Amino acid sequence: MDKFQIHGNGPLKGEIRVSGAKNAALPILCAGLLTADTVALDNVPNLQDVRTTLKLLRLMGMQAEFDGARVTLNGADVNVLEAPYELVKTMRASILVLGPLVARFGEARVSLPGGCGIGARPVDQHIKGLQAMGAEITIEHGFIHARAKRLKGARVVTDMITVTGTENLLMAATLAEGETVLENAAREPEVTDLAHLLVKMGAKIDGIGTDRLVVHGVERLHGASHSVIADRIEAGTFLCAAAATLGDLVLRGVQPDILDTVLDKLREAGARLETGDDWIRLAMPHRAKAVSFRTSEYPAFPTDMQAQFMALNAVAEGTARVTETIFENRFMHVQELNRLGADITVEGNTAVVNGVPRLSGANVMATDLRASASLVIAGLVADGETVIDRIYHLDRGYDRMEDKLSAVGAKIRRIA
C-alpha cells in the first residue's frame, strides 16, 4: 500500500497547473449515457474515481478512450443497464448512472453506493425525484431497480440540497416528456458545468447556476465537445499549502470567481492575493492568523476545504472555531493532526483549533480524501519526517499531487 514520505522544508515557490474538477468530470462522464453519439471531453483529471467510472461505463457497453486529459465516449452500443456492487462500493458517484439509464433506456439497476466513510449521504432524494417523474422503483438485494416507459416532467422539491441528486435528476429530466422543475437545486460550479455540457448536447435548461432549474425535455440528445472546469478544491488545497509554508505560489488554469469564499478566508488569514482570468497568485509574508468558518452549500464555504483549513489553522496565530454542517463524521483528521502536535478539540460538530508555533513529523494515517490533503499540508510544515499511510484515498481526488508539490520545492515522495 502506497505512502507519502514528507520532509518539512520551507516555502512552496513556483507555478502549478490545476487539473480538471473530479466532481464535474464524474457526472459529465455519466452524461455520455444519454446519447448514442460521440461526446469528446478535455481537461479530464487522471484519477482513480475517473478510471473507475470509465470501467463502469465500458462494462455497460460504452466505448471509452482516455488519452492524456482527453476522453472520447460513444454510447451507441450500451446494452448492460446495471452498475454492480464491485464497482459502486468503491465510489459513491456511481449512482450518477441511474438518471441517464432510466431516461434513455427505461430501466436501470444500480447497487446501493459506497465511497468515503464520512457519514450518511442518502440516495433517497434521487429516488424521490425519479418517482415524481413516473419511475417505478424497488430496492431489493442491495440494488435500486428503476423502470419507466418514458419519464414525465414534474416539479421536484428535494428535502435538502444534494449535489449528486441535482445532477442525476437534471440528466434524467433532459429526456423526460414535458417540463421538469428542480427546486432547491444545488448551485455548485460542477453542477453548472454539467448543465453547460447538456445544453451543448441539445438539452433545454433554464436557470443554470440558480437553485431553480427548469428543464424542457427533448426526444434525443446528440454528441458534443466540452472542457471540464478547473478543480476548485485542488486549487484551494495548494493555496492552503502555500499559506501554511509561507510560500509564493501561482496557480494556472483556474477560475478565481468560483473560489471566492476560500480566497476571502485566505485574505483574512493574512495572505496577499492577486487574480487574473485564469490564474491566482498567493504570497504569505508571515505566520497565518487563525480563521473561523462554518461549512455550507455553495456559494458558502465548501466542506471539501474544511480539513485543509484545519491544517492551516493548526499552525496559525490564535484560536479558530470550525463548524461542519454538511457531513457528520468529518473530523476524522483531527486525531491524526494532533499526532503531529496540533492542539484541536472537537465539541459536537465544531472543532476548536488552538494554533501552535510548529508541528513535528510522525507516522499518520489518511482516513478519507480531504483528510489526506490536510495531513500533506501539515507534513509540509512539520519538523522532520512525516509518513502518511493509506494515500489511496488521496489518489481518488488529486492528480499527481506529489509531482506538482515537488515541482514547487516540497520534499515529498511516494513509497511502497
Swiss-Prot record:
Main subcellular location: cytoplasm
Positions of phosphoenolpyruvate binding: K22, N23
Species whose genome carries this gene: Cupriavidus taiwanensis (strain DSM 17343 / BCRC 17206 / CCUG 44338 / CIP 107171 / LMG 19424 / R1)
Record's GO cellular component terms: cytoplasm
GO biological process, alphabetically ordered: cell division; cell wall organization; peptidoglycan biosynthetic process; regulation of cell shape; UDP-N-acetylgalactosamine biosynthetic process
Descriptive protein name: UDP-N-acetylglucosamine 1-carboxyvinyltransferase
EC number: 2.5.1.7
Subcellular locations according to the entry: Cytoplasm
Biological function: Cell wall formation. Adds enolpyruvyl to UDP-N-acetylglucosamine.
Metabolic or biological pathway, per its Swiss-Prot or TrEMBL entry: Cell wall biogenesis; peptidoglycan biosynthesis
Family: Belongs to the EPSP synthase family. MurA subfamily.
Signal peptide stretch: none
InterPro entries for the chain: Enolpyruvate_Tfrase_dom (IPR001986), Enolpyruvate_Tfrase_sf (IPR036968), MurA_subfamily (IPR050068), RNA3'P_cycl/enolpyr_Trfase_a/b (IPR013792), UDP_GlcNAc_COvinyl_MurA (IPR005750)
Keywords, sorted A to Z: Cell cycle, Cell division, Cell shape, Cell wall biogenesis/degradation, Cytoplasm, Peptidoglycan synthesis, Pyruvate, Transferase
Coiled-coil positions: none
Reactions listed under catalytic activity: phosphoenolpyruvate + UDP-N-acetyl-alpha-D-glucosamine = UDP-N-acetyl-3-O-(1-carboxyvinyl)-alpha-D-glucosamine + phosphate
Residues modified to 2-(S-cysteinyl)pyruvic acid O-phosphothioketal: C116
